[in-house]
Amino acid sequence: MAIATSTQLARALYDNTAESPQELSFRRGDVLRVLQREGAGGLDGWCLCSLHGQQGIVPANRVKLLPAGPAPKPSLSPASPAQPGSPYPAPDHSNEDQEVYVVPPPARPCPTSGPPAGPCPPSPDLIYKIPRASGTQLAAPRDALEVYDVPPTALRVPSSGPYDCPASFSHPLTRVAPQPPGEDDAPYDVPLTPKPPAELEPDLEWEGGREPGPPIYAAPSNLKRASALLNLYEAPEELLADGEGGGTDEGIYDVPLLGPEAPPSPEPPGALASHDQDTLAQLLARSPPPPHRPRLPSAESLSRRPLPALPVPEAPSPSPVPSPAPGRKGSIQDRPLPPPPPRLPGYGGPKVEGDPEGREMEDDPAGHHNEYEGIPMAEEYDYVHLKGMDKAQGSRPPDQACTGDPELPERGMPAPQEALSPGEPLVVSTGDLQLLYFYAGQCQSHYSALQAAVAALMSSTQANQPPRLFVPHSKRVVVAAHRLVFVGDTLGRLAASAPLRAQVRAAGTALGQALRATVLAVKGAALGYPSSPAIQEMVQCVTELAGQALQFTTLLTSLAP
């Protein structure tokens, strides 16, 4: 090797996990031999160190250089004869002058074979805190592996690593005295002695041929020595899978495998996510399209759906007033008008002569489905039908024309022809007739709901109920009246005939003003309860609102013969 040996030692300040094959793994308190200091050979921030016979780079900020002691004698290189099967060489007794091994004097004359003498076990016990029985196991070659035990805080048993040091440098590092004289010639790397790098090769070869010699710390993948002691620290999984990996010391350091030998994932998370997305896309592409979702019946369909455009008749309109239909633009008018609802017996009269389009629309058997049919307007809010409601509505003249429709209530509307002012009859175009037919039926349902809500509110007021009971009834009144106002506003914008727009806007404006007054009166009655004048004002406003709603509904009914 071209690297010159060094006597500089460094102590590990933190645990380190190797992230590359060139990096060493160590734990806090380990003593490493510095081969090249930081900055030497282009290693900025790294030191080239040796630990347990392994060389690698070490982060310079995780180790601390120890003060250099006096150079030891070169007698450590040729070690004393080693006993066969014993992994720990015994350096010469001339090492007593070194400052690295702070060991009491009785530890030196400890015998190397056979049962130890009396003064030998007490000294190692005070230094390494090992069981007393381990001092008597130096005779057998396999039992010699348990001589170098570490403090109980580390809970580890030494292995065949040539550099077996305690976990903390605060403890004395010398345990070479009890070694038999016949051990291997591989010296410890801990003493401050220059050792030729050529002497490390036979040491590694001698270790490779011996089975019970795994290192204590995590070893790279190139040194695969299976033993139960590998589980004490972080070890690669392929080493733990060997047959000898089931010792009693397994799981002492139960930490995740963070080293470079962690088993790679068969597929990265990003690839898994992309694979799942591709699979989902294929399933969606093969699946049939979802069935058409039917529209739910809702009384608010007029406000939720865009209004269609009025069809422009091919024949000129008989109305003398110019039609502004071609000038109306926008998304609301760009869609065809839905087919009109079925004619009511009372409202269905002979169509305007010369109107072929309306007749074709009625006679067309393949017409589009009317999405506005079957909407139960009067029953949406689940009004409470009180007993006195039928009597109050029975006094009003029933509309004989409405009896043919089972969906419309039998409360009845007044005769529609009575609301028309005397004069020349209004000429309505085909598109306006379709709008009137559609919204006239809607107004009948809205007015029926308004009647039920007004009857419930009047009954609650007569019973002198608190606001928490009559305010919900007033909300239903406001909602039903607001739908009528919306119908008037829509007809005022979409009607092609100017006289028709004027009449509808006038009736809708009066209804909106009555609705605004009713809302203010209900708020005043709720805040001033139990004030009789406030209740009376609310009753008057509700009565006026009901009258305006009746006039508006009658107007639309009369305009759609």
Curated annotation (Swiss-Prot):
The keyword Phosphoprotein applies. Phosphorylated on multiple tyrosine residues. Phosphorylated on tyrosines by FYN and SRC. Pfam families: CAS_C, SH3_9. Keywords: Cell adhesion, Phosphoprotein, SH3 domain, SH3-binding. The modification Phosphotyrosine is found at residue 253. Signal peptide: none annotated. Residues 68-123, 171-215, 240-372, 390-422 are annotated as: Disordered. PANTHER family: CAS SCAFFOLDING PROTEIN (PTHR10654), EMBRYONAL FYN-ASSOCIATED SUBSTRATE (PTHR10654:SF14). Contains a central domain (substrate domain) containing multiple potential SH2-binding sites and a C-terminal domain containing a divergent helix-loop-helix (HLH) motif. The SH2-binding sites putatively bind CRK, NCK and ABL SH2 domains. Docking protein which plays a central coordinating role for tyrosine-kinase-based signaling related to cell adhesion. May serve as an activator of SRC and a downstream effector. Interacts with the SH3 domain of FYN and with CRK, SRC, and YES. This is Embryonal Fyn-associated substrate. It comes from Homo sapiens. The lineage of its organism: Eukaryota, Metazoa, Chordata, Craniata, Vertebrata.
